[in-house]
Amino acid sequence: MEQNENTLSVLKIAPGQHPQQVEIDNDLKALQQAVGGSIGASYPFEDPVAIVYNDDGKLMGLPLNRALRDENGQMYDAVAGDFLVVGLGEEDFASLTPEMAQKYEQLFHQPEAFLKLGNRLLVLPMPDEPPTEKPRTKTPAEHDR
């Protein structure tokens, strides 16, 4: 994708969907529009990237999107609603490099479903295609009376 300083090449990740590489304007209004409200930013990775999310997403009841996991694979938080993975420049957000875009597309590729069990939250990968119903191989039993 062609980049200039007025646009950012980022990953947009919506609940239940695969990440999409998109171009957005490099301004606050465009970031807010992309996540549906006030933005928050988190820097959970060692790479020069940030997650830009709706700061009020959980309070608004937006659907949980993806789990954030520590280095041991344990979930420590979940992002609600649409979020962006953006690059970091010296003082501001920047376009993702092709390598970072590929890395984080793979990390967040599989949509996740969240299931509350008591006071625990279970995170399950969503299948790419809905399961198809298998044809029945046996006919219903007939009863003689």
Q: Which stretches of residues belong to each language-model region?
A:
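N-terminal nucleophile
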Residues: 2-131
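Non-Sec secretion/translocation targeting segments of pathogen effectors
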Residues: 132-145
